[in-house]
Swiss-Prot record:
Homotetramer. Pfam families: Hexapep_GlmU (PF24894), NTP_transferase (PF00483). Its EC number is 2.7.7.27. It comes from Exiguobacterium sibiricum (strain DSM 17290 / CCUG 55495 / CIP 109462 / JCM 13490 / 255-15). It is an enzyme of class 2 (transferase). The lineage of its organism: Bacteria, Bacillati, Bacillota, Bacilli, Bacillales. This is Glucose-1-phosphate adenylyltransferase. It comes from the Bacteria. The gene is glgC. Alpha-D-glucose 1-phosphate binds at Y100, G165, E180, K181, S191. Gene3D superfamilies: Hexapeptide repeat proteins (2.160.10.10), Spore Coat Polysaccharide Biosynthesis Protein SpsA, Chain A (3.90.550.10). Involved in the biosynthesis of ADP-glucose, a building block required for the elongation reactions to produce glycogen. Catalyzes the reaction between ATP and alpha-D-glucose 1-phosphate (G1P) to produce pyrophosphate and ADP-Glc.
Amino acid sequence: MAKKNVVAMLLAGGEGKRLGALTKHTAKPAVAFGGKYRIIDFPLSNCTNSGIDTVGVLTQYEPLELNRYLGIGSAWDLDRRNGGLTILPPYQAQNGKNWYEGTANAIYRNMSYINQYDPDYVLVLSGDHIYKMDYEKMIEEHRQGGADVTISVREVPWEEAPRFGILNTDEDLRINEFEEKPENPKSNLASMGIYVFNWDVLKRHLIQDAGDAESSFDFGKNIIPNMLYENLNIRAYKFKGYWKDVGTIQSLWEANMDLLEADPEFDLYEPSWKVHSVNPNQQPQYIGNNASIETSIINEGCHIEGEINHSVLFYGVDVAEGSLVKDSVIFPNVKIGKDVTIHRAILADGVVVEDGATIGTPNGEVFVIEANSVIPKNEVVKEAIQ
């Protein structure tokens, strides 16, 4: 294989328990987002737009749908003879272990994949965040700063800080303290789960970590703290753009609603930074004579006869006459009958809502209806169907 300056490793095996029914039968990175996309489209598109053409995607939990979606990477221009996109599922190791035991272990068990390209840098990414980033700028700052490791960071609300790896830096952005998901955080500067490593440094630490019986084999809990203990040059790269961890029902719904702002912070329509996805090859959408649509995203193949207000509809959605869909996210191939009312809900793929049913309330919690559920005629859904 020809040498590659950068190899990206995309961690896409997450179960996503906090997404409930949405990840019951599929990996979190394959969850639908934004009327057209899957969550994994965003880091993959970032790689393409950043000129990174060698990406290993590490899958594990419920990988069938994700693997089928990724294919050979052609949607992201990653179908290459040298490099491109490679799916890296767990395999039976010599010690008899099958599953990846942590984020660091997943990379460790695929060192041979990385070694064949003899890279200078390894970019480690998470497959479950919504954002646009030019990774090349981060890599260049890493290179110019003489860093061993660079971690992309941003400030988060204090109440959310315990969900993240939290760090402190000096005035030159050198990281001097890192704590994974602290109960009482000292800072609100959070790791985004995006790392640039010098490959020789990372390789050495992965091998050391694999031999530690007490390790959790995790970047945040083990690798980064061990590197800090060795006083390596670990630097922060401050990211100021939109970034959303969509690991909960509420945050996923909010991120979809963010797209509907008059001047959205996260703009899907930016021509200079396209988000690539697999084309569903649907027919054009049809808007009926009595339909009403306001501040919404409507994808291909939709047939709308009712009222859509401040909502995101994926491809192949039917909404019959007299129905209202408001402040909701409707996944592909959902069929909504006549005189249905839906407020603040996420309906997963293939849901059928029969005539006269009511789902959700204008001011309540966000409801989730599991894929392929059938909501009977005139049913009033007061609890999420998961």
